[in-house]
Amino acid sequence: MKIGVLGIQGDIQEHLRMIEKTGNEPLWVKSTSELAEVSGLIMPGGESTTMIRLMKKYELWDALREAIASGLPVYATCAGMILLAREIINYPEQETLGVLDIAVERNGYGRQVASFETDLEIPAIGDTPFRAIFIRAPIIEKCGDSVEVLSTYKEKPVLVKQGKILASSFHPELTDDLRIHEYFVKEIIGKE
């Protein structure tokens, strides 16, 4: 199965490597024609305002919103999650795709120097804790009724699912643990 990584900015190579390790074909997505080729898409972390500018420059902004509305499975990490959110509490003027019913706070867990790692309980992927890496991570402050919380940190959601959308505040691509990427492939994209 061909799974894309939105390839305009962020942890692109790391996600491509994880897709390959799950036994699927990775594709670096930089155009609408490449977007049309994939069975699922990963939106990496990076800097959300830069990502918006580049997505619009390469005509991916509206195409991605339409693809997600049409059922394209998406997994978004960190800044990717910010782009999907319905609302950014501390930057209300920032545009989003608005397809995930959450309200987030950018850099909610602190700036770069406040980055940290912690073990998370994620029952959907097994009993062994997942070592999560948070880098300038957003906090999910509110979730709509259609959003399922898969994991929390200090009572705040950090891994959520809504239909064919999976999103995390943390960066599983920076670990060697494939379980979240495998969950995306098996449970969100499903079998073709």
Curated annotation (Swiss-Prot):
InterPro entries: Class_I_gatase-like, PdxT/SNO. SUPFAM superfamilies: Class I glutamine amidotransferase-like (SSF52317). The keyword Lyase applies. It holds the Pfam family SNO. One of its GO terms (cellular component) is glutaminase complex. In the presence of PdxS, forms a dodecamer of heterodimers. Only shows activity in the heterodimer. This is Pyridoxal 5'-phosphate synthase subunit PdxT.
